[in-house]
């Protein structure tokens, strides 16, 4: 799954215990995420290996709606569509005429898109979180509490209260950088775009 296999302490936090600092960061992140009940944006994505060599560069558009609905469409020539209605995930590759269908893993550490669209009460259960804030930019570092994850470290940044970019680092040092632009929040979204109808002639793989 190319999109998903693929957020430092604030000055005041140094005067707090780790638990207090973490709680402040959880509250701040929840506050920012809760501002967007729906979100649409264009994105550009760059994947690098541990030495910094570029592996892949893609772009596309995304849409999110609480709770747990998301749609990520990667543009051609590496077109791919990832859709979830909150219960089921479809990963469609038109070039291969193939769709993989699976139940949505509700663990935030397995589905980073749920950080933006899922149950905010689960964030503190899944991650150790720190943050710093300066000049309208808020950077969060999220480290999974479980070892059974798709990434070791995730950075999520907001600019002027709007999500700006995300970086995921996996166990071998591979980095996936995602930049969001043209972000629009709290607009009415058609629920149909978070469902998927399998095109005729498409191979279906059920996982």
UniProtKB/Swiss-Prot annotation:
Q: Where in the cell is it found?
A: Periplasm
Name the SUPFAM superfamilies for this protein: Prokaryotic lipoproteins and lipoprotein localization factors
- Family annotation (InterPro entries): LolA/LolB/LppX, OM_lipoprot_carrier_LolA-like, OM_lipoprot_carrier_LolA_Pbac
Entry GO CC = outer membrane-bounded periplasmic space
Q: Which UniProt keywords apply?
A: Chaperone, Periplasm, Protein transport, Signal, Transport
NCBIfam families, alphabetized: lolA (TIGR00547)
Q: How does this polypeptide assemble, per the annotation?
A: Monomer.
What protein name is recorded for this chain? Outer-membrane lipoprotein carrier protein
| Gene behind the chain | lolA
């Amino acid at each position: 799954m190319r999109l998903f296999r693929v957020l430092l302490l604030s000055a005041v936090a140094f005067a707090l215990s780790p638990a207090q600092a973490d709680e402040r960061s959880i509250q701040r992140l929840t506050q920012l995420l809760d501002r967007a009940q729906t979100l649409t944006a264009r994105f550009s994505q760059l994947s690098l290996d541990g030495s910094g060599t570029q592996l892949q560069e893609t772009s596309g558009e995304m849409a999110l709606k609480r709770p747990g609905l998301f749609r990520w469409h990667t543009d051609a020539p590496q077109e791919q569509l990832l859709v979830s209605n909150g219960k089921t995930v479809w990963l469609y590759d038109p070039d291969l005429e193939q769709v993989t269908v699976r139940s949505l893993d509700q663990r935030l550490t397995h589905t980073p898109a749920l950080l933006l669209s899922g149950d905010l009460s689960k964030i503190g259960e899944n991650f150790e979180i720190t943050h710093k804030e300066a000049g309208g930019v808020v950077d969060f570092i999220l480290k999974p509490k479980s070892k059974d994850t798709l990434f070791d470290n995730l950075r999520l940044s907001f600019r002027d209260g709007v999500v700006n970019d995300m970086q995921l680092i996996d166990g071998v040092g591979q980095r996936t950088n995602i930049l969001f632009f043209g972000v629009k929040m709290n607009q009415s979204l058609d629920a149909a775009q978070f469902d998927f109808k399998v095109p005729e002639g498409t191979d279906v793989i059920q996982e």
